[in-house]
Amino acid sequence: MSEQLIEAVKASNSARVRELLAGGADANARDAYGATALMNAAYMGNLDVVNDLLAAGAEVDAKDELGWTALMKACNNAEMDRGFPDVVERLIAAGADVNVSITYGIRPLMIAAGYGEGAVCEVLLAHGADVLAKNDGGLTTLMMVKDKFYVDVINILHAAERDAGVGEGSCSSKNAPGSNVVTFLKPLARTPDH
């Protein structure tokens, strides 16, 4: 029944997921890569299925073979080229760790920012994501995304760093590679025409 549940989740078949859960399917079923049903639902952005799995006892911070959690999967679906702020919000409400890290010290905020997901970044920051956390290379999220020209994300992160007490002269907000992007793009993002 676990395999059927994973298939139903990946197909975003909410009715079938509910039917299988009611029939005793394990809400923590895993696919061949170690991803749980909840991770797959989060990756697909299916809030209804996420809710059903959580109600059935899915473990919110379970990790796959690479250490990814459902929250990380909801931060960006590379195939759909989008993240899912509503799913991120729900997972956090269920107790997901917003500062969990994987290989190289990558965190959910870094994933969302790296793909230009401003709305997801805002949700994560509102729930305690550490904007000053560094990856294993010593880079903060802002330092990692400055050269990507995600103006909204850069401005969100810059404001969050400022709110965290990092001044304009800090390494993260001014002296890092690509810092000219913040200086150049910040004024543009604030105009009503952009």
Question: Which residue ranges define each predicted feature?
Answer:
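Alpha-helical adaptor scaffolds
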Residues: 65-68, 72-85, 89, 99
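Ankyrin repeat A-helix N-terminal signature
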Residues: 7-12, 40-46, 73-84, 111-117, ...
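N-terminal segments that cap or nucleate solenoid repeat domains
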Residues: 1-36, 40
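Ankyrin repeat structural motif
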Residues: 13-21, 46-54, 80-92, 117-125, ...
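Ankyrin-repeat-protein effector appendages
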Residues: 1-7, 94, 127, 139, ...
